[in-house]
Each structure stands twice: as C-alpha cells, then as structure tokens.
Amino acid sequence: MALEKSLALLPLLVLVLLVLGWVQPSLGKESRAKKFQRQHMDSDGSPSSNPTYCNDMMKRRNMTQGRCKPVNTFVHEPLVDVQDVCFQENVTCKNGQANCYKSSSSMHITDCRLTNGSRYPNCAYRTSQKERHIIVACEGNPYVPVHFDASVEDST
C-alpha cells in the first residue's frame, strides 16, 4: 500500500525536479542591465564633495569583493535619461563593437579610480566629480545600457 502511494507520487517528484533544474540556474543570476545599474547608476546620490564617496559606494555596490575594481563611474542622472542614450549618437565602442551610444548632453558623473599602492582588501579610491558626455553599450529587448564604455568632454 505504501509502495503504491510512493509510486503514484514519483511522476510528480520527477516533474518538480525537472522544473527546478530548469529554473534554478537563472535564480540569483544578475542580468547585464541590472549589473550596469548596480555598478553605474546613483540617481539618488547628488554629486557632492564627499572625498569618501567612491570608497563607500564601491564597497556598498560589491565592487571590492575578491579584488579592487580599478576604475568605475557613477552616473547621477535619472535612469530613464541614461536609458535614452541608447537611442542617441551611435559611436564605436573601445573594443570595436558597434553598439555604443554617446549622450547628446553632458551628465553629472563621479569618476572613481584606485589610488596608487592600494591593494585588496583595503581598496582606496580617488573621487572626482565631473560633467561629461557618457558612452554606453546597449543591447537586449528592451534596448538598454549594459556597459559603461567611457566619458568624454564637451567638444564645443
């Protein structure tokens, strides 16, 4: 009797395991768009003269785990404005790809650079506030930023 009940539940167990095996790899995997937002967007943070901004943000955004990320840029503009860059001037990316776009207007950014002699786990960054055009790589559907390629000064 117990064996019959166990055998009746076997197909259900197999189905559950198959679904878990299919869904599980995507659980916890950050999309490229979400990674871009985590690493580069700080819409709420207004640029300030806080000299520890980069040290704090790089740690808070998990970019000092296992190593010190040498360079990072935070953009202090609304996410929708940064996403709109994907439909502005098409430029060639540093790696030669053709999916980069340059913002039509300058944006408030913070440039974070690892200081000389700084080593993991004591990552120390130099914080620089700038107003620059940004260049981002875009992909997907919807077409959104997935990589911060560069920032450039106004060419006027």
From Swiss-Prot:
Residues 1-28 form the signal peptide. It is found in: Secreted. The active site is at H40 (proton acceptor), H147 (proton donor). Its EC number is 4.6.1.18. Glycans are attached at N62, N90, N116. PANTHER family: RIBONUCLEASE (PTHR11437), RIBONUCLEASE PANCREATIC (PTHR11437:SF24). Belongs to the pancreatic ribonuclease family. This is Ribonuclease pancreatic. The lineage of its organism: Eukaryota, Metazoa, Chordata, Craniata, Vertebrata.
